[in-house]
Amino acid sequence: MNAMVLDDVIKSQAGYLNPYILEERQLNVTQLDVFSRLMMDRIIFLGTQIDDYTANTLQAQLLYLDSVDPGKDISIYINSPGGSVYAGLGIYDTMQFISSDVATICTGMAASMASVLLVAGAKGKRSALPHSRVMIHQPMGGAQGQASDIEITAREIQKLKKELYTIIADHSGTSFDKVWADSDRDYWMTAQEAKEYGMIDEVLIKK
């Protein structure tokens, strides 16, 4: 059995506390940050806003885990306010592309683009802790400059809106029209309400 203890030093990078652990193996002791250690158990954390860096990291982790053990489940724990739609769609497409089922678990908040990733988990393997919140809404964006440039941006936002609502409707089983209407403004759901909406399959309660 591996013995693991919390390291005395917690490394701080860009204001984010990244704890390290010491993993004691038969022949040596290896220092790992806790997220890397969890990834060895096929657990990935999405605990920040979704941007290009986050998306690149998550996509790389998904592709790596799928390559070392194709078909074995991967879990993504989500506590995120959302972020870039383009970056999030990159994560979404990777989740659908790999052969491994991706289980999604909301551990606090899955809002905006993060809610799309939550509902995109493998059917029957999407869950949330009891006091989690899920929020869907229409994509936001701004434009300035010439009228033609503003029109181009507006058309793109409408395309993204339809694309995101289609994804939510397909994975949740809720009608496209209802998703469209509900997302006109911020639409917040408790864990139980998210289950009834089809965003998750189970509310996790300790037995």
Curated annotation (Swiss-Prot):
Localization per Swiss-Prot or TrEMBL: Cytoplasm
Database matches in Gene3D superfamilies: 2-enoyl-CoA Hydratase, Chain A, domain 1
InterPro entries: ClpP, ClpP/crotonase-like_dom_sf, ClpP/TepA, ClpP_His_AS
The keyword Chloroplast appears for this protein: no
GO cellular component terms given for this protein: cytoplasm; endopeptidase Clp complex
UniProt keyword list: Cytoplasm, Hydrolase, Protease, Serine protease
Function: Cleaves peptides in various proteins in a process that requires ATP hydrolysis. Has a chymotrypsin-like activity. Plays a major role in the degradation of misfolded proteins.
Description of how the protein assembles with itself and partners: Fourteen ClpP subunits assemble into 2 heptameric rings which stack back to back to give a disk-like structure with a central cavity, resembling the structure of eukaryotic proteasomes.
Official protein name in the record: ATP-dependent Clp protease proteolytic subunit
Organism placement in taxonomy: Bacteria, Pseudomonadati, Bacteroidota, Bacteroidia, Bacteroidales
